C-alpha cells in the first residue's frame, strides 16, 4: 500500500479529488475528471482488485464520500472516506489503508425497525423492501469550507423494541445533523417538520410514512432534503425542505409537490436534486395528483428557486397514464449536462427526456418522437421492451411495456466520442448515447453487456483524466432480482468509449462475494473505487502494488449475519414499485 501511495504522489493524484456530494457535483453528472491512475490500460495491464474491506454496523444505502488531506486530531493528516449506515452510524475511515478501526464513528440514535410502517394498502403487495432497520437512507453532503458533513437520520425515540417485536407504539422523528469532519462531534442538529396534515395522523405518523431517500443538496448556503413515501403507505406527499447550513434552522416554507392532493414523492432512486449555477433546483416526482392550476405536480420535472418556489415544470403527454399505472417519472433523478442548457432524465416507461433548463415547457402536447412543435427538446425510448411473455401482452396492468430506468444517467465528454451519457436500465444492456449540439442525441445506443434478471439495473460513475482514459463503473446485482430480496452484487468496469468489459469483481475475484447495495453508485477517487454493500462492509478496490499478491485484506472479521445470503433468487414479475 505504501508503494501505491508513492505512485499516487508521483502522478500528482495525492491531493487531487474530493467527492463531497452524490454523483460528484451539483449537476449530478457522476463523473470525476481528475483520475490519473485508473485507466483502461492500467486495468488491462496491472493487477486491479479488492484491496481491503472495512466493517460497519448496518447496510449502506448512501454513496461514500471522500475528503483528502484532512487533519485528524492525534492521527495526523489523512485521506478519509465517510460512510453512513441504516443503523444510524456515521464512520470516518482512512481511505487508503486497511486499518481495523475507524478514525471516528458516531451513533445518531436508534433506527426505526422496518415493520413500523402501516400496512394499510400501501406496503408494496405485503412486501417490505427496506429491512431490518431504517436509519440514514440518503447520501450526506460535505461542506469543506465549514468542515462539516450533513446527515439526515430516521430515529426511533425512545428506542423501539427490535424488529421482531409486535408493538406498533414507536415514536419516530427525522433529524438533520452537522458533524465535524475531523472528529464526528455534533455541531448542530434539528428535528425536521414535514408539513403535512391529515385527519388522525400525528407528526410521528407523518415521519413514519415518509422516506428521505434522495441525496442531500448543499447550495445557496442551505441544505436541501427531499421526501417521498415509505412503502407507499398513505397518506403521504412529496416535499423539499431547506435548512440554514450554519445553524440547521428549518427555513419556511417548505415546497410540497401536491398541495391539497396526494403522493408526488421525490425519491429518485437515491439520486439527489440537481442545481444550476444560479442556485435553482431540479427534481423529478413520482406518481401523484396532477393539476398545474392547483400546483399539483405528480410525475413532473420541476425547477425550483433557491427559496423553493416553482419556477417552471414539464410533464409528459402521458402523465395521466403514468400516475394511474404506477409508471413513475421520478424513478431516477435529473442530470444537468455540462456546458449545455439541457437537463436529462427518465423513469419507468424507459424514455429519456431532454429539456431546456431555461424553458422546461409545461405539459407536452404530443408524444410522437419526431414532433418538434412542443417541448421537450428531444425524447426517445432508451430501454428495451419486455421479452414476449404473458405480462408483455398486458402492459396497462404491469407498468407499461419497457424496462425501467432507476439510475440517473451519467455524463462524460470524451475526446474520441464526444459528449456521451450512460445508463443501465433494469434487465437490459448497459447503454451509451452520443450527443451532438445540433441534432441532440443519436437514439441508436452503443450497447454493452446484459444486466441481471429484474430489478433494478446498474448504478454508474465515470472516471477519466479530463477527456481521456474514461472508465464507466457499474454496481449491479450479479444475477438475481433485487426488488425485495437481498442478492449478490458485482462491480464492473467498462471502457467508456467502447463499453468493452475491462474488469469484473465476479470474473476476477471469485472470493469477492458481497450483497448488492440497491440504488447506490460506486465512488471513484484518487486511484481507488469505494463500493458500498448490504453485507455491512465497504469494499475498497484499486491497483495492487508491483509484485504484490492480489489477496484482499479485511480490516476486521466480516459480518456473519444470516440475513446476508450471498445470492438469493428474487421475486419475479414486473408490477413493481421499488421505492426504497
Task: Go through the PLM ranges and name each one.
Residues 551-580:
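Polycationic, low-complexity disordered segments in secreted or periplasmic proteins
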Residues 547-549:
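N-linked glycosylation sites
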Residues 10-14:
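N-terminal signal peptide c-region/cleavage motif recognized by signal peptidases
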Residues 17-305, 309-362, 406-413, 420-433, ...:
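Mobile, glycine-rich extracellular loop/lid and propeptide segments
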Residues 339, 351-451:
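A glycine- and small/hydrophobic-rich beta-loop-beta segment
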Residues 451-452, 463-465:
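Extended C-terminal subregions enriched in glycine
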Residues 396-400, 445-452, 478-485, 508-513:
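Short, contiguous acidic/charged loop-to-helix segments that flank catalytic cores in large enzymes
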Residues 1-7:
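Sec-dependent signal peptide recognition
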Amino acid at each position: 500500500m505504501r508503494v501505491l501511495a508513492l505512485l499516487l504522489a508521483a502522478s500528482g493524484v495525492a491531493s487531487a479529488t474530493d467527492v463531497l456530494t452524490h454523483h460528484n457535483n451539483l449537476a449530478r453528472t457522476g463523473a470525476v475528471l481528475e483520475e490519473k491512475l485508473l485507466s483502461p490500460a492500467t486495468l488491462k495491464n496491472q493487477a486491479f482488485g479488492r484491496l481491503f474491506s472495512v466493517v460497519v454496523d448496518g447496510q449502506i444505502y448512501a454513496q461514500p464520500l471522500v475528503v483528502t488531506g484532512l487533519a485528524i486530531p492525534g492521527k495526523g493528516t489523512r485521506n478519509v472516506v465517510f460512510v453512513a449506515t441504516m443503523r444510524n452510524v456515521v464512520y470516518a475511515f482512512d481511505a487508503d489503508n486497511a486499518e481495523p478501526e475507524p478514525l471516528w464513528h458516531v451513533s445518531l440514535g436508534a433506527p426505526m425497525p422496518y415493520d413500523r410502517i402501516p400496512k394499510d394498502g400501501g406496503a408494496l403487495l405485503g412486501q417490505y423492501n427496506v429491512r431490518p432497520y431504517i436509519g440514514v437512507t440518503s447520501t450526506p453532503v460535505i461542506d469543506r469550507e465549514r468542515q462539516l458533513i450533513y446527515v439526515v437520520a430516521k430515529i426511533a425515540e425512545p428506542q423501539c423494541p427490535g424488529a421482531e417485536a409486535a408493538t406498533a407504539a414507536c415514536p419516530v422523528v427525522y433529524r438533520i445533523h452537522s458533524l465535524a469532519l475531523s472528529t464526528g462531534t455534533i455541531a448542530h442538529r434539528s428535528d425536521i417538520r414535514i408539513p403535512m396534515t391529515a385527519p388522525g395522523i400525528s407528526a410521528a405518523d407523518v415521519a413514519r410514512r415518509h422516506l428521505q431517500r434522495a441525496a442531500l443538496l448543499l447550495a445557496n448556503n442551505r441544505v436541501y432534503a427531499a421526501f417521498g413515501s415509505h412503502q407507499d403507505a398513505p397518506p403521504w406527499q412529496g416535499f423539499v425542505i431547506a435548512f440554514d447550513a450554519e445553524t440547521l434552522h428549518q427555513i419556511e416554507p417548505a415546497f410540497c409537490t401536491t398541495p391539497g392532493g396526494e403522493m408526488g414523492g421525490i425519491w429518485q432512486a437515491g439520486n439527489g436534486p440537481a442545481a444550476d449555477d444560479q442556485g435553482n433546483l431540479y427534481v423529478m416526482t413520482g406518481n401523484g395528483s396532477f393539476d398545474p392550476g392547483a400546483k399539483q405536480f405528480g410525475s413532473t420535472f420541476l425547477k425550483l428557486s433557491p427559496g423553493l418556489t416553482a419556477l417552471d415544470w414539464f410533464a409528459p403527454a402521458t402523465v395521466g397514464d403514468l400516475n394511474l399505472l404506477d409508471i413513475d417519472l421520478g424513478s431516477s433523478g435529473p442530470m444537468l449536462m455540462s456546458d449545455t442548457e439541457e437537463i436529462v432524465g427518465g423513469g419507468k416507461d424507459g424514455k429519456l427526456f431532454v429539456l431546456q433548463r431555461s424553458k422546461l415547457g409545461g405539459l407536452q402536447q404530443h408524444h410522437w418522437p419526431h414532433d418538434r412543435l412542443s417541448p421537450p427538446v428531444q425524447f426517445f425510448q432508451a430501454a428495451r421492451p419486455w421479452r414476449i411473455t404473458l405480462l408483455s401482452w398486458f402492459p396497462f396492468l404491469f407498468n407499461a411495456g419497457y424496462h425501467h430506468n432507476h439510475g440517473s444517467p451519467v455524463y462524460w465528454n470524451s475526446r474520441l466520442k464526444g459528449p456521451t451519457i450512460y445508463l443501465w436500465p433494469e434487465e437490459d444492456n448497459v447503454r451509451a448515447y452520443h450527443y451532438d449540439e445540433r441534432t441532440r442525441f443519436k437514439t441508436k445506443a452503443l450497447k454493452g453487456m446484459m444486466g441481471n434478471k429484474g430489478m433494478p439495473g446498474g448504478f454508474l460513475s465515470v472516471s477519466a483524466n479530463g477527456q481521456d482514459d474514461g472508465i464507466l463503473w457499474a454496481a449491479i446485482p450479479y444475477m438475481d432480482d433485487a426488488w425485495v430480496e437481498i442478492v449478490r452484487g458485482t462491480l464492473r468496469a467498462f471502457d467508456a468509449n467502447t463499453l468493452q468489459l475491462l474488469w469484473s469483481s465476479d470474473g476476477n475475484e471469485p472470493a469477492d462475494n458481497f450483497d448488492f447495495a440497491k440504488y447506490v453508485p460506486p465512488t471513484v477517487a484518487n486511484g481507488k473505487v469505494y463500493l458500498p454493500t448490504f453485507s455491512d462492509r465497504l469494499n475498497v478496490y484499486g491497483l495492487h502494488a508491483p509484485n504484490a499478491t492480489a489477496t484482499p485484506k479485511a480490516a476486521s472479521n466480516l459480518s456473519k449475519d444470516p440475513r446476508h445470503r450471498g445470492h438469493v433468487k428474487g421475486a419475479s414479475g414486473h408490477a413493481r414499485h421499488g421505492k426504497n
